[in-house]
Design a protein with these regions (language model features):
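Compact integral membrane and secretory-pathway proteins
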Residues: 2-171
Length: 171
């Protein structure tokens, strides 16, 4: 595999006419990459972490949006970079931006983002302690969707950057 194709061409970015996106609408893989990258932008605004604790007949819930975390903010910037990379046929740039999004989505998937419950910050230990006394429902839906859409964008961008030809005719 020729890894030199995965080096973003920053000189070409400076010469682009940004008023005219050059996406190849006949290329299904490029369209899939574009849709996945746009979905990554949308999924940053979903709750990346939510918890619902039911103890002693009382229910309490909290959630944290992906955009309110440092990795969500960086993820938004990288997802927008991936969208721009796909729109302007800079697939190497889109690939690396999507790979960073995958890593950030994985971090968001695994983390207990600092939640505020009862006016104080809940830690992972608080949630584990609550699990001993009641039912705890933990969700990472936004981070999971961000992770998978970024992974799809990364794979499609990699295929486009390396020039792999896949005959996918959906029309």
């Amino acid at each position: 595999m020729d890894f030199s194709k995965l080096n973003p061409d920053f000189n070409a970015l400076g010469r682009l006419d940004y008023s005219k996106p050059v996406i190849d609408t006949k290329n299904t893989i490029a369209l899939i990459a574009l849709v996945a990258a746009v979905l990554s932008v949308v999924f940053v605004f979903l709750p990346w972490f939510s918890v619902k604790v039911s103890m002693f007949g009382q229910s309490e819930s909290a959630s944290r949006l992906g955009i309110t975390t440092w990795y969500g903010i960086i993820g938004l910037i990288m997802a927008l970079t991936a969208v721009a990379g796909v729109l302007y046929k800079q697939y190497a740039l889109a690939f690396w931006a999507a790979v960073i999004c995958v890593v950030l989505g994985f971090i968001g998937w695994l983390s207990y983002a600092s939640l505020t419950m009862d006016g104080r910050t809940a830690t992972a230990d608080d949630i584990k302690l609550a699990a001993n006394f009641g039912a705890v429902t933990i969700g990472h839906l936004g981070a999971i969707l961000f992770f998978f859409s970024s992974a799809i964008a990364a794979v499609c961008s990699l295929l486009m950057a390396t020039g792999r030809k896949i005959d996918v005719n959906l029309r």
